[in-house]
Each structure stands twice: as structure tokens, then as C-alpha cells.
């Protein structure tokens, strides 16, 4: 399972760890992903989405029905 938010599209970013001596070593910054079940009232069922914390905020603000409609329109199977 890839580490990508289904709502925002956030994915791991690449950067550097920096030591006290300012040495750089490669690292990945992972998105804050959670598998979360959302109740969809119109379908009378739960839908599981892998979303970041920002994705959950978007769903809270706009509503799960609207976000699901956009996901399905873009070709995501939900």
C-alpha cells in the first residue's frame, strides 16, 4: 500500500537530516496518514479511506459526500 493520501495526494517528500556538525544524510518526510472509516449517509455504509490529517480536515469542512463524488469523478475506486 503506497503512502499517499487519497484526498490531498500528499506523498513522502525527500530531504536531509542535519547533525550538529551540519552533516547531511538523506531521509524521507512521511505524510501523517491514517486509515479512517467515514459513514456515508446516502449509501448507508462506511467507506474506508487512507487520508492525511489535512485530508480529514477537508472532509470535515466540505463533507464526505462531496469529497467522495470528486474522488469517483477522478477515477478512484471507493
Swiss-Prot record:
One of its GO terms (biological process) is translation. Residues 1-24 are annotated as: Disordered. Gene3D superfamilies: Ribosomal protein L28/L24. SUPFAM superfamilies: L28p-like. One of its GO terms (cellular component) is cytosolic large ribosomal subunit. Keywords: Ribonucleoprotein, Ribosomal protein. Coiled coil: none annotated. GO terms for molecular function: structural constituent of ribosome. Belongs to the bacterial ribosomal protein bL28 family. This is Large ribosomal subunit protein bL28. The lineage of its organism: Bacteria, Pseudomonadati, Pseudomonadota, Gammaproteobacteria, Aeromonadales.
